[in-house]
């Protein structure tokens, strides 16, 4: 199968990291990018230099109407309205919607007017079906024009929750994500009328925050609906976050038995999605890791055979962006069979 031709709307944090990931993804070919706020010369600069993930290793040339990256032309558009982006011109029939603005089905569907066939929103959506690779992607049947790749935290949590629930049955669970700061936070204290704590400087504080990531697991694993909720602690790190999952299980098991089940899944059906480590890792060790979830065997604890705390890392930028591309390629394969 030929690589899936993809367009990106929004060349911000996730848009650029999706692009970088695509260079390593043989099944994806980025052919077009749209961003009304970034000129091509600036786009080249932002792609080349990244404070968190380092300098781009490939060749970038600025053209009159786009970029040439590693010898391949990428068309650039500057349309504010998704309906006006001529995706068909570049045969970009699959689009990553990464502006963070057009996250509903109705808004994201505007891409179809320009020739896109399918849109993957790189964020949770209020109404678009959500898919998490390794968890419920096989339920995709090609009918939806707009789908969501859920959130980075849901992508970390859901594979782990699936393994535990499949083997031991989850009765109830609470999650905390210790999450790196993101672009929505403040460099210094500033006004934030809807979230007072969120207006405090990200660089100096641990900031309690809400997250819908745990509840979203109930959408991709229906049997966990109502059994799982969670919160977030925003911390002063640039990338790599960690899920702390405290779970009560029906089938009694020692922590060692639970570890073995997770290890088996990581080396089997969830290989490439879920990883397993017994190393003494810290957050920066996962910078640039492609996995959705890296289970830390040494960090977890159990109170008894029915009550356990599990810890799993994720690069909330890099690993998530890789799953966006994996989902795009997966749905294109399903679509091509129909």
Curated annotation (Swiss-Prot):
The keyword NAD applies. GO terms for biological process: glucose metabolic process; glycolytic process. Pathway: Carbohydrate degradation; glycolysis; pyruvate from D-glyceraldehyde 3-phosphate: step 1/5. NAD(+) binds at residues 13-14, 35, 80, 316. One of its GO terms (molecular function) is glyceraldehyde-3-phosphate dehydrogenase (NAD+) (phosphorylating) activity. It catalyses: D-glyceraldehyde 3-phosphate + phosphate + NAD(+) = (2R)-3-phospho-glyceroyl phosphate + NADH + H(+). D-glyceraldehyde 3-phosphate binds at residues 151-153, 182, 211-212, 234. Its main location: cytoplasm. Disulfide bonds: none annotated. Its EC number is 1.2.1.12. SMART domains: Gp_dh_N (SM00846). Keywords: Cytoplasm, Glycolysis, NAD, Oxidoreductase. It is an enzyme of class 1 (oxidoreductase). The record marks 179 as: Activates thiol group during catalysis. It comes from Sclerotinia sclerotiorum (White mold). Belongs to the glyceraldehyde-3-phosphate dehydrogenase family. The active site is at residue 152. This is Glyceraldehyde-3-phosphate dehydrogenase.
